[in-house]
């Protein structure tokens, strides 16, 4: 069941669901690619496990090139139908979906990478895509938010992520004034560097007053989430996650804004990371900030942080921590 939301101080909400990324729509390096060869989308079967665990929010990564084959062109009806089927399936289970354009402020057309905000790929083409998506999904009651862009980073000096986000916000609000809009931070959405890299996002204007800010937080020494080294070499401590996410949480509270951790994760094999994770999720829960684990989905195998849900009933150790934190307080 979906909890009733109660406003808290600092812009945070109680009853906000925690959840998981079901990543597979962003897979592959061929664009738009062939469905079920280069990429796929999760289905109702991928929701069963997470519903049973009470983790009721799903972040759904997708690639712009697959839902719209050419800038300013129509939406791809085949992919759109598959995404709608997934959103409907989630809704029947009382689960919410956060869209995630997993494009890093870029898209690849005919093998050539283009950056939004350059002459090759205008801000307006990006806004037009989001206007059409909002037109298609504004009637769904279980859209947690339109996630404008995954991990903006390394843009040329002539390009502004702030402007890009504002164009998308303005475009969406021409057709949908109710659904939240989720804005990722600059520099890979880093929670630890949020104030240095993303402070200007607080000046974004939303006529609906319904923005949520998204940060990512991995606990290894460089924040990449690769966890290549030992706990000690990665500078692990029980409170490391709390220390890394605190700049973002304090920024939210200071500016009376809402937030979410769109990605976090730990490796298995060293129980000390589990204590770090427990402290991290406890801190977020108490501060009204939900979080989404990276990652699960139908094509994942045993990568460093992933949680495949098909391994003969054997659960990964992260689960016993995650299922303690189902919603914010």
Give residue spans per PLM region.
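Solvent-exposed loop/turn segments at secondary-structure junctions
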Residues: 23-28, 57, 63-68, 103-106, ...
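N-terminal carbohydrate-binding accessory modules
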Residues: 5-59, 321-324
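Surface-exposed, active-site-proximal loop segments in enzymatic domains
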Residues: 28-35, 64-81, 105-121, 226-231, ...
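Extracellular glycoside hydrolase catalytic/binding regions
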Residues: 35, 39-40, 124-145, 149-290, ...
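Well-ordered alpha-helical segments within folded domains of soluble proteins
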Residues: 59-62, 98, 260-261
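An active-site-proximal structural segment forming one wall of the substrate-binding cleft
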Residues: 38-57, 72-103, 107-145, 161-173
């Amino acid at each position: 069941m979906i909890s009733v939301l109660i406003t808290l101080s600092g812009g945070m909400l109680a009853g906000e669901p925690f959840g998981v990324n079901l990543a597979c729509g962003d897979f592959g390096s061929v664009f738009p690619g062939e469905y079920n060869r280069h990429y796929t989308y999760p289905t109702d079967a991928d929701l069963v496990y997470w519903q049973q665990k009470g983790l009721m929010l799903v972040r759904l990564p997708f690639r712009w090139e697959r839902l719209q084959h050419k800038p300013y062109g129509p939406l791809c009806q085949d992919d759109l139908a598959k995404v709608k089927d997934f959103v409907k399936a989630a809704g029947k289970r009382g689960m919410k979906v956060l869209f995630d354009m997993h494009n890093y402020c870029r898209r690849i057309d005919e093998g050539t990478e283009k950056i939004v905000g350059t002459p090759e790929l205008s801000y307006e083409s990006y806004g037009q895509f989001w206007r059409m998506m909002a037109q298609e999904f504004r009637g769904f009651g279980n859209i947690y938010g339109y996630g404008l862009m995954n991990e903006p980073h390394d843009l040329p000096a002539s390009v502004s992520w702030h402007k890009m986000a504002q164009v998308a916000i303005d475009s969406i609000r021409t057709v949908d004034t109710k659904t939240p809009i989720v804005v990722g931070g600059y520099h890979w959405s880093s929670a630890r560097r949020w104030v240095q890299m993303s402070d200007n996002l607080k000046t974004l204007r939303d006529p609906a007053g319904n923005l949520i800010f998204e940060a990512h937080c991995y606990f290894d020494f460089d924040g990449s989430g690769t966890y290549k080294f030992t706990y000690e070499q990665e500078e692990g401590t029980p409170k490391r996650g709390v220390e890394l996410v605190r700049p973002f949480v304090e920024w939210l509270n200071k500016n009376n804004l809402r937030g979410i951790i769109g990605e976090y994760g730990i490796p298995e094999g060293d129980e000390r990371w589990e204590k770090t994770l427990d402290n991290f999720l406890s801190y977020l829960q108490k501060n009204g900030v939900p979080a989404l684990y990276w990652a699960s989905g139908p094509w994942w195998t045993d990568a460093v942080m992933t949680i495949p849900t098909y391994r003969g009933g054997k659960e990964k150790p992260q689960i016993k921590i995650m299922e303690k934190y189902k919603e914010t307080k």
